[in-house]
């Protein structure tokens, strides 16, 4: 019995227009902070499609520049950072869903899409991992900023965790600022109608539950009157070594019994691609 051909959406720009969505060939990734290094290492979005409270696309590497201007003692100071990230070093499909308020930075690393190493582009430090009871730990590793463990449990209730397992068990999930973002290493096939059906299902299940669950969240570490804010320690997870360095370490460990000259050569090749 032959397999039925998958339905294709055709031209992405026309597909977006037909559905009342906006198509942009390139754009910035979602939920970037004012940190210059975060901006220049985040990659660039290609084929961005956005609707009411959500967006989707593909993030790849490339050249990025970010700058910040401020005045000090009557002097204008401009800081500019430029980085050329190899295009193929970042390749992530994503769906980002707007939430009602800013939240602590939380990451769910899906175990299903990991190889020897995590598939996350920016791996949080292991000390920030929060272990959970039940089946959830079999599907995801949860990371929360130090001191925000109870906040993470407030967000990821058992019913939301069950939806995450059912609908996004093969995808990495991140809550950053006021966005819930799911990622797929290697990208989503945006020309496949099934991809858009899955996006709609994730929005109506995970997205809807996350919205109602986080609407009443308050960070009691911030000053009264700033209820929509998150304390400085909760805004971003602390990162581990960049992926390229982790790969180098893994390769070096695998060849630990080989002559030191071989290990040094491996490090030099990997380092040149960072």
Identify the residue ranges that each predicted region occupies.
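N-terminal pre-transmembrane cytosolic regions of membrane proteins
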Residues: 1-3
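Juxtamembrane boundary at the C-terminal end of a transmembrane helix
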Residues: 261-274
